[in-house]
Each structure stands twice: as C-alpha cells, then as structure tokens.
C-alpha cells in the first residue's frame, strides 16, 4: 500500500478553476490534493527583442513559491537577488511545455507571460503548474479572440504533466511529498492531449530502474494525463 492509501494508478483529487484572477487575461487555480498553484496569463503587446520583425510571438513562464507554501518559511528569492537553479529549471520547463502546443506565429509579435505561484506545496508543483498553466493560457487566447486581437486560436493541442514513481517495487501515479521522499524512483512526464511526449525527467534515487519499469511508468503517466486533459476540457467548457 502506498503512503497516501490511494490505488497505484489513482490521481489525487484534481480541480481546475478558471477566471480566478480579476485583472489577468487568463487565470486558473489548480489543485492536486494539497498542492495548490495560482496560474495567470498576461498579454504583453511587445514580444522579445530577438523576435522583432519575425512575425512570431512568444510564450514564457515564471514560477515561484510563497514563503509559507511549505512546512517552514522559505526566504523570498527576490531578497537573494536571483531565482534559484530549481526555480529556473521549472519555469523553463513550463515555458517549453506550453510552446510545444502553441502556434507562435498566430499570436503576432506579442508575448504572453504565464506566472505560476505555488500557494501550498505537497509534491508535484511543477506538474500542477503545467496543467493549470494550459488552462490560463487557453483563457488568455479566448480573451484575445473575443477582442479581435487575434483571428484564429493559437492553441494546437492540450498539454498536461504528471509525476510517477516506483515505491517498494510498485509503479505509482501522482506522488505527494511523503511518497516522493520515500520513492525508489521518481519521474515527471509532460504529454500532449494527442499522446505526444514533450519532456521526461526521471531519477533513480536508490538503484537504477529497468527499461521495462520505465515503460510501465510511461503507460501510467499517459493514463494519468488523459484524465487531466479531460478535466482541462471540462474546465474551459
């Protein structure tokens, strides 16, 4: 039995609530069990300087954790002068994941910044961020189309992310903090609605895992992402 008492292939309770931020062009409050992330998408009329004249837009992301998102207060990274290596890795992952399903020329020479702020962390903050960020970005595109800023929907597909791991030899889906801490292996999968793999991050904590075990985790992740995509569809109507 896994620490959370869930079945090996069972997600935590996941909710996706759009339109929670009054001023953002798109927003979503995403929860994976006790992990809660606020995702907002903001339209900037100017794209990055290096894309000027290309006719192409850009989607990027920023990620942060509130000081008391964890058991003990963490110092705000702004007071340290720069984001940590972990923060930079995660926000780049979120940006890559979103761009994988966006037709960038359809945005025009504009930039959309998706901010993912962790309100409470209990494992899987990066996977929750990607899943909620897609909803926020979708809402931003809907807002833009409603005001004739763009004429076509730039979103080509869904994208969501989920963690998997091996706990006492058993593959499990959607690890919370306690499970992640005790897992023999943990991995994050970013997968599109059509089943395309955007990114895989996997680490053996105790002993190497086999190809067969990896494929088992992949199958588990694909099934989990299919459930998340269904929830995204429900959230955006």
Curated annotation (Swiss-Prot):
- Binding-site residues, phosphate: 86, 124-126
Give, as one word, the top-level EC class: transferase
- What is a single Pfam family found in this protein's UniProt entry? RNase_PH
Q: Which UniProt keywords apply?
A: Nucleotidyltransferase, RNA-binding, rRNA processing, Transferase, tRNA processing, tRNA-binding
**Which family does the UniProt entry place this protein in?**
Belongs to the RNase PH family.
- Record-linked PROSITE patterns: RIBONUCLEASE_PH
Report the GO molecular function annotations. 3'-5'-RNA exonuclease activity; tRNA binding; tRNA nucleotidyltransferase activity
A Gene Ontology annotation in the biological process aspect, one of them, is: rRNA catabolic process
Its recorded name reads Ribonuclease PH
What does this gene product do? Answer: Phosphorolytic 3'-5' exoribonuclease that plays an important role in tRNA 3'-end maturation. Removes nucleotide residues following the 3'-CCA terminus of tRNAs; can also add nucleotides to the ends of RNA molecules by using nucleoside diphosphates as substrates, but this may not be physiologically important. Probably plays a role in initiation of 16S rRNA degradation (leading to ribosome degradation) during starvation.
The lineage's top-level taxon is Bacteria
- Describe the subunit structure: Homohexameric ring arranged as a trimer of dimers.
According to the UniProt entry, what is the EC number of this protein?
2.7.7.56
Organism from which the protein derives: Methylobacterium sp. (strain 4-46)
Catalysed transformations (reactions): tRNA(n+1) + phosphate = tRNA(n) + a ribonucleoside 5'-diphosphate
Task: Enumerate the CDD domains for this protein.
Answer: RNase_PH_bact (cd11362)
Query: Which InterPro entries is this protein grouped with?
Result: ExoRNase_PH_dom1, ExoRNase_PH_dom2, ExoRNase_PH_dom2_sf, PNPase/RNase_PH_dom_sf, Ribosomal_Su5_D2-typ_SF, RNase_PH, RNase_PH_bac-type, RNase_PH_CS
UniProt cross-references to Gene3D superfamilies, sorted A to Z: GHMP Kinase, N-terminal domain
